[in-house]
A protein has these predicted regions:
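Flexible, acidic/Gly-rich N-terminal and inter-domain linker regions that tether
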Residues: 1-73, 77, 81
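Amphipathic, non-transmembrane alpha-helical secondary structure
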Residues: 21, 39, 103-111, 115, ...
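Structural signal for hydrophobic packing residues in well-ordered secondary-structure cores
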Residues: 27, 31, 58-62, 88, ...
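N-terminal pre-triad scaffold of radical SAM enzymes
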Residues: 49-93, 98-124, 186
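Conserved SAM/AdoMet-binding glycine-rich loop
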Residues: 118-200
Length: 200
């Protein structure tokens, strides 16, 4: 499969999981997939086959055009008390690697040449024991004042739950204040924190 070219063979030739053949036939005919089809696409180990189908649809819809978002990712702090076992990022308060970025630090980053053309600022970080809603309101307002066109995409769901709690706010009140200050979306990681059944 060429990087930007149409597939040269029928989709079935790119599949290693025979269960995907009926889905590939639907894709080739331009038919809508069912929930069950989606579940199988999620469960199959045949990632190249799924990728071939996705490439087929993308090429049919958009030809050789590819779209992307110029995003800058920053972490406003690496200080975190959570100690997740998968995280090599965190630092404890007092650790020489520990940092908290001020709004001014973030503005300096956005003024650097590597941020030229950025349309989205993506920020996620740890659970800093002393940050509260006021820090985020100040940060969002200053970024939006200096870069009104940049989309602010901030917080995993776990961060929202944590910072709402330590700020003495409901999740809804915390988000209302963040949105009023400039927050526009969240990446969505950790949403299971809000559902007891999923967390269990």
């Amino acid at each position: 499969m060429g990087s930007m070219s149409a597939l040269s063979l029928p989709l079935s030739a790119y599949l290693s999981d025979p269960r995907l053949a009926p889905i590939a036939a639907k894709v080739e005919r331009g038919e809508r997939l069912s929930f069950e089809d989606g579940l199988l696409l999620y469960q199959t180990p045949d990632l190249p086959g799924v990728g071939a189908m996705a490439h087929f649809v993308r090429t049919r819809l958009h030809g050789r055009r590819t779209y992307f978002v110029a995003s800058r990712r920053l972490s406003y702090t690496n200080i975190c008390y959570t100690h997740c076992q998968f995280c090599a990022f965190q630092a404890k308060p007092g650790d020489p690697r520990a940092y908290v970025l001020s709004a001014e630090d973030i503005l300096r980053e956005l003024h650097k040449p590597e941020s030229r053309g950025v349309v989205e600022l993506h920020m996620v970080a740890g659970h800093h024991p002393q940050l509260r809603i006021e820090y985020f309101e100040d940060l969002f307002r200053k970024v939006k004042a200096a870069f009104p066109a940049i989309h602010l995409k901030v917080f995993t769901m776990v961060e929202i739950g944590y910072y709402a709690k330590v700020s003495g706010l409901s999740v809804e009140a915390f988000l209302d204040r963040c949105v009023a200050a400039g927050l526009e979306s969240c990446p969505g990681g950790g949403a299971e924190i809000f559902d007891e059944e999923v967390r269990a």
